[in-house]
């Protein structure tokens, strides 16, 4: 079933009021790939009455107030993408299109949507007469506002904002909200809802951020907001501590002073067990837009997520420009084959399914089914990364589980083709001496749509080091194997290379060498080139703001002039006579 979004739907369900109202910057797509839908269905399955208001009109309180007041809390998310990333290009031009808005026109998601929606809710709540049967109001309090989603998660502590070109406070202060749940948050939101329902103090919930007058005992102190605004060295120190305390096994709680109050971040929620993941993806998602919003126009995102299957969560690639580490986590956890097969079978029964599974994968497709046992028991290593600069010998890289999974899914009745579109880490394939070639052969022969996406992002060693990406040697060896397997299979398939221009440390001379390398070694004229966007809470953004390598302290070149950023991209793409399409961060392979 769909979560209700109108009073008429609530009435048809026999509900007198809602426990939770979710507010989202995306249109309401009932899909396991949409965070608001997942959180809503998890709460609904636990017995809570949940409604959703998608992309509310912010010019008045009529839209936000159509479902009344919730008994327990408001849940606010900017949507699947940070609203500033959704609304502006890397060159700070307004985007015309939005894949998550009906009709595709980018007119419904406000800038800094988390803050705007929180303000809108408060305006509505203040307009409601005091007498109410709602449990929070019985205690003399309005229902709390709880922030979530990627925008809130990545802005939960003091952070650099590219669009203001300044350090901003935690979004919890700017939104004047009550709580913030970071990460994937299914377990955290259930714990929070239970506390609010039962009248218990929620401040111990893992994965929760809140504002306090005094710092909690035993938590690590981050340099204050005022300090990091004034001192880039302090900001670097702050980010190191923040980044290192995202692992559920080893993380400490954190606090950061803002003025005369404190932002408190509890340790992260434990990663989901396989049984929990299986249960989440077994919920009854409709995999389409709610009819109320569908009447306003189709959403382009459904073309990608409508019939895709998530096999796992998390990524230990830790690319410095990627936000997955501090949102979804660096520990990979995966669903059981039985759960994935059951979902694939359900897809075949969907009236709109044509036999094609658009993607079977995760943040990185070929991380399914294996993880470091030391990390699982003791937490992440603080002195080194899992697969950079080399794959750690403790990482038991094994593609066999995914090989077997792909075979089983593609053999299901009603399935014509299963694509692996998430993107691959070719260094993992090269590292797997036992099953790496077998896996690549499987993908080449059965799971490519004509082009395989890989993301070297650059080819110059000095830039790759700052990105945290493997060197060009691994790329060339992977290309050689891919081409050999294509010849053996009698197929004409190609590699598509994603590249980044104007990353910290990258010069125009570096991009000229990228162009020459692509022509000489890759035999292509690159099309998929994007200008680096400094998004909150990544190491690359830290480099952009401080103009330093945070790991060595050495100064680095950072291109900040918008025209020269565009020039870096054009050096590689100008032979095409156009500048190419901007690609969404969420679709880039790791």
Whereabouts are the PLM-identified features?
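N-terminal pre-triad scaffold of radical SAM enzymes
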Residues: 23-28, 296-323, 356
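Short, low-complexity, charge-dense intrinsically disordered segments
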Residues: 576-590
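Flexible glycine/acidic-rich beta-alpha junction loops that bind and position SAM and/or redox cofactors
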Residues: 82-91, 154-156, 186-191, 215-216, ...
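Conserved, mostly hydrophobic/aromatic
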Residues: 178, 315, 340, 454, ...
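N-terminal [4Fe-4S]-dependent radical SAM core
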Residues: 1-17, 27, 236-308
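Terminal amphipathic helices with adjacent charged low-complexity linkers/tails
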Residues: 59, 202-234, 239-247, 260, ...
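Glycine-rich beta-alpha loop elements in corrinoid/cobalamin-binding modules
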Residues: 35, 54-128, 140-258, 265-266, ...
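Conserved SAM/AdoMet-binding glycine-rich loop
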Residues: 22-25, 38, 52-53, 57-58, ...
């Amino acid at each position: 079933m769909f979560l209700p979004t109108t009073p008429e739907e609530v009435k048809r369900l026999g509900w007198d009021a809602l426990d939770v109202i979710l507010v989202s910057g995306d249109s309401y797509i009932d899909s396991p790939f949409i965070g608001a839908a997942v959180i809503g269905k998890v709460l609904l399955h636990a017995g809570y009455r949940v409604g959703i208001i998608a992309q509310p009109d912010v010019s008045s309180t009529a839209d936000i107030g159509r479902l009344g007041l919730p008994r327990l809390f408001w849940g606010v998310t900017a949507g699947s993408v940070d609203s500033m990333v959704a609304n502006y290009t890397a060159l700070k031009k307004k985007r015309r299109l939005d894949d998550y808005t009906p009709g595709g026109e980018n007119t419904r998601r406000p800038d800094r949507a988390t803050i705007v929606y929180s303000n809108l809710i408060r305006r509505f709540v203040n307009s409601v007469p005091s007498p109410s049967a709602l449990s929070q109001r019985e205690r003399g309090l309005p229902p709390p506002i709880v922030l979530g989603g990627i925008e809130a998660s990545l802005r939960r502590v003091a952070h650099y904002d590219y669009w203001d070109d300044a350090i901003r406070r935690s979004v919890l202060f700017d939104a004047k909200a009550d709580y913030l749940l970071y990460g994937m948050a299914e377990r955290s939101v259930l714990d929070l809802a239970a506390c609010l329902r039962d009248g218990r103090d929620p401040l111990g919930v893992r994965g929760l951020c809140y504002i306090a007058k005094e710092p909690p005992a035993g938590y690590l102190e981050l340099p204050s907001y005022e300090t990091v605004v004034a001192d880039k060295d302090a900001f670097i120190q702050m980010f190191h501590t923040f980044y290192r305390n995202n692992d559920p096994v080893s993380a400490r709680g954190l606090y950061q002073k803002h003025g005369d109050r404190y932002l408190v971040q509890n340790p992260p929620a434990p990663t989901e067990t396989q049984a929990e993941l299986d249960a989440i993806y077994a919920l009854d998602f409709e995999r389409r837009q709610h009819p109320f919003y569908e009447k306003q126009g189709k959403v382009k995102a459904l073309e990608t997520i409508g019939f895709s299957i998530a096999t796992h969560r998390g990524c230990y690639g830790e690319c410095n420009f990627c936000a997955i580490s501090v949102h979804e986590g660096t520990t990979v956890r995966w669903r059981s084959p039985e759960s994935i097969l059951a979902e694939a079978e359900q897809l075949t029964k969907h009236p709109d399914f044509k036999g094609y599974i658009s993607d079977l994968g995760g943040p990185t497709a070929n991380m399914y089914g294996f993880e470091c046992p030391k990390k699982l028991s003791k937490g992440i290593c603080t002195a080194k990364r899992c697969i950079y600069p080399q794959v750690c010998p403790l990482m038991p890289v094994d593609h066999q589980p995914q090989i077997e999974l792909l075979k089983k899914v593609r053999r299901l009745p009603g399935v014509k083709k299963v694509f692996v579109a998430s993107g691959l880490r070719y260094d993992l394939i090269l590292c797997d001496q036992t099953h790496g070639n077998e896996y690549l052969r499987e993908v080449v022969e059965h799971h490519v749509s004509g082009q395989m996406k890989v993301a070297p992002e650059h080819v110059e060693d000095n830039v790759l080091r700052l990105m945290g990406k493997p060197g060009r040697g691994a790329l060339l060896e992977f290309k050689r194997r891919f081409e050999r397997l294509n010849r053996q299979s009698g197929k004409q398939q190609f590699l598509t290379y994603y590249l980044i221009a104007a990353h910290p440390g990258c010069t125009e001379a570096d991009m000229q060498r990228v162009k020459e390398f692509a022509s000489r070694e890759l035999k292509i004229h690159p099309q998929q080139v994007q200008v680096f966007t400094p998004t909150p809470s990544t190491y690359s953004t830290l480099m952009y703001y401080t103009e330093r390598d945070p790991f060595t302290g050495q100064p680095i070149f950072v291109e900040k002039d918008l025209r020269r950023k565009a020039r870096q991209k054009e050096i590689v793409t100008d032979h095409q006579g156009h500048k190419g399409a901007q690609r969404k961060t969420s679709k880039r392979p790791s």
